[in-house]
Amino acid sequence: MSEHFMGLSKIKTESCVHGYESAWLSRWTPSNKNAKEIHLPEDGHLLKESTGPMKLKGKMLTLFPNLDSPVQSVDVIPDMNKEPPIVADRENSIDGEEEEASSQATQSKNVEHFLNNNTNLLRECKRIWSDSETNSRSQVKRLKTNAADNRGNETKNMMVFEEGPSGKKVNHFFHSIFGMTNLGSRRYQKFSTSQNKNLNMGEAEDVNPWIQRWCKRKAADVHEPRGGQEVNSNGTVLEKQQFPSIAAMAMMRKALSGINPTGCRKTNSLFVWNAEDLS
C-alpha cells in the first residue's frame, strides 16, 4: 500500500514537472517564433544573413567580442544622415586651388564690369545734363527774342496811336486783348477825330437855344462900337475869356433840367435841391 502510494506520488510529481515544463515552453516559444537567428562564428563577428539595418560591407559590430581575437576595439557604425568628412587629397587640393583662382578671377571681372558700368552711367548722365542745359538755354533765348519783338511792335503801335490831333492816348494793350486789328483801330481813330471836330465847331448845339441866342447877341455887342467909340482890344480879349464860363453855365443848366423841379429851390443866384432826388 505504501509502495503503491509512493508510486502514485512519483507519477504525479513527474506529471506535474512535465506539465510545468510544457507550459513554460509553450509560453516562451510563441513569443520567439518571429525571432531572427543569429549565428556567431568563432571570431565573434555577425554574419550578413538578414535584410535588417545591420548590413555592412566590411566588418560587423562585435557584439560578443572574443578574448582570443587580436582585435579588441569596437567599430562604430557611421551615421548615414551626416555628410562624410572631406579628405584632403592631392586631387581635391588641386581642384580647390582652381576653384579659388576661378572665384578670384570672377570677382575681379565683376569689379571691372561694375566700374565700367559706373563710368558709362556717369558719361550718360553728363550728356543728358548738358543736353537739357542747352535746350533750356535755347528756349530762354527764344523767349527773350520773342518778348523783345513783341515789345517793339507794341511801342510802335502805341506811338502811332498817341500821335493824333485829338490828343487822346489809346493803349494798344487793350485793343490787342479785345482782338482789334489795325483796320479797326484806324476806324476808331477816324471816329474820335470827327467827333472832336464836331464838338469844337458846334458846342452850342448841345445847350439850350436861349443860351445860343444870348451868346450871339453878346458877340454882336462886343464887335459893334458903343456910342461910336472904338472898344479897347484888351476889353474884347477879357470878354472872350468869359465865354468858357458861359458854356459851363449852360452845361450846369442842362444838368439841372433833369432834376425834379419840386426838389430844387432857387434863392437869389443859388440853386438848392434835396439829396434824395440825386440818389
Curated annotation (Swiss-Prot):
Protein name: Protein PHOTOPERIODIC CONTROL OF HYPOCOTYL 1-LIKE
Originating organism: Arabidopsis thaliana
Main location: nucleus
Statement: the UniProt record of this protein carries the keyword Nucleus: yes
Null allele phenotype: Reduced seed germination in red (R) light; this phenotype is reversed in plants lacking PIF1. Reduced PIF1 degradation in response to red light pulse. Hypersensitivity to gravity stimulus and increased greening. Increased hypocotyl growth independently of far-red (FR) pulse at light-off, as the result of a rapid loss of active phyB due to increased dark reversion. Highly unstable phyB-containing photobodies in plants lacking both PCH1 and PCHL.
Coiled coil residues, start to end: none
Induction description: Induced by far-red (FR) and blue (B) lights, as well as transiently following transition from darkness to red light (R) in a phyB-independent manner; responses to red and far-red lights depend on phyA, and responses to blue light rely on both phyA and cryptochromes. In the dark, binds to COP1 and undergo degradation through the 26S proteasome pathway.
Function: Together with PCH1, regulates growth and development adaptation to the ambient environment by controlling negatively phytochrome B (phyB) dark reversion, a temperature-dependent thermal relaxation process during which phyB reverts from the active to the inactive state. Contributes to red (R) light-triggered photomorphogenesis. Promotes various light responses such as seed germination, hypocotyl gravitropism and chlorophyll biosynthesis, via direct interaction with PIF1 and COP1. Prevents DNA-binding ability of PIF1 to negatively regulate the expressions of its target genes.
Transmembrane intervals: none
Keywords: Nucleus, Ubl conjugation
PTM entry text: Ubiquitinated by COP1 in darkness; this leads to proteasomal degradation.
Entry GO CC: nucleus
Annotated disulfide bonds: none
Taxon lineage: Eukaryota, Viridiplantae, Streptophyta, Embryophyta, Tracheophyta
UniProt GO BP: red or far-red light signaling pathway; regulation of photomorphogenesis; regulation of red or far-red light signaling pathway; response to blue light; response to far red light; response to red light
Subunit: Interacts with light-activated phyB. Binds directly to PIF1 and COP1.
